[in-house]
């Protein structure tokens, strides 16, 4: 932004030559700089904090003794994982006190490439939620599947100078960093040359490998699951982003590792969080509750949720209640439950008692619609011929993204093709970006499905169609339903569609209200377990969406076939 037109107004209001816009009285203000509570009037004007003084004002707000916090900041989130559009996501999190997020849109980038990134910038431009993008560093995520786009350093350079781009998204290709891969280092340099942050992703790295990763000026990691990992990264000067998502919930394990000495290198993030969890448990406000319940000082916790994130990602005018900073703030009842009562963004009331009170424009862009592009399929598309009855099977683990590499004697029909049964279900991945006709077919154990099929276009990271079923006819109906809806999640049985959740934005997001999406999702979960008999130990849709990610051991399936993560090579289903 250009500050000069604003400066006259700010100085005149602060000096008392002009009325301020708002004075907040009777608030207990959390001062994240001095780690104290300030009880004084707070003057606001031009969307900025002006100072702690009484003034002539156009409006006043009685905080009634509540605590006033800087607006909360999510240090790393994939908005697409909420299953709703950016505007609907903003409606969810603003009501919980989050006023800024660092969003890594690598899901939509894998489908739509630069057009998807431009959509995310355009769709968030006029929202009261401040959305900064971390440009995805790994599109495609691996060379073992067909994604919708390839983004090299030259492509990312077209957007890196945008003022709302915070830097480079999580560098998942840590082997490439350690090996000095030229394309990887080009992307890192692209951000560093502009003084922007490089986000990290280094699960399991330690010792010299971790030091090498940090030497590449990668600033953060949100993959810590132990206090030891957390402390090692902080000792190397990295920020640790403590994650509490829908699947990965690390806060309870990591919060005891926060100390007065290292707290300033901690940030809160959600990574992937579904709307039902935000509606029920909250967003970054939930991190505050967990942190305090595990002994973290409340003011320290607020600092982690605000100033630390702002400093980590270069948001120099946010993260604190101080003169000249953007007047994002939250009123909460206390510093234990953190019940959010009012939320202000740039000095304007945007949410009250859990409800957003301003219009949030949704952004329509044809470039991210109609993204299901498949070659016509027939009833032979999912046939799986096997030379013998012995087959490699993907074994599901309850409550885990890991799979087992199994060998099973499997049933076959008269033509030698696999027929689901004996607890075994057919799995297929259909390429949906360029109509290549690629269909990978495999077998899974532990899913429990009987009498139908489940399919989704949310399939990490390339987001092809993944479908599981115990008969080819219902699998075909499910894929055709996703083609009809432009993507989403569907359940089929007996040749008909039982339920669908359309996700027409890139096959990843709905533009319907989050409450509606959450209700439909809950109904579909019930159908999946009750009607299709999917195991209660399995989350039906998230499990499917990660069976296609060929970086998490042991066996995974892509549109190119069965992949053994242990050897990083394709293998055959038949043994």
Curated annotation (Swiss-Prot):
Biological processes annotated in GO: adenine catabolic process
GO MF assignments: adenine deaminase activity
Catalytic class of the enzyme: hydrolase
Superkingdom of origin organism: Bacteria
Keywords (A to Z) from UniProt: Hydrolase, Manganese
Disulphide linkage map: none
Reaction(s) catalysed (UniProt annotation): adenine + H2O + H(+) = hypoxanthine + NH4(+)
Enzyme Commission numbers on file: 3.5.4.2
Keyword Manganese annotated: yes
Pfam families, per the entry: Adenine_deam_C (PF13382), Amidohydro_1 (PF01979)
Annotated HAMAP family: Adenine_deamin
Protein name: Adenine deaminase
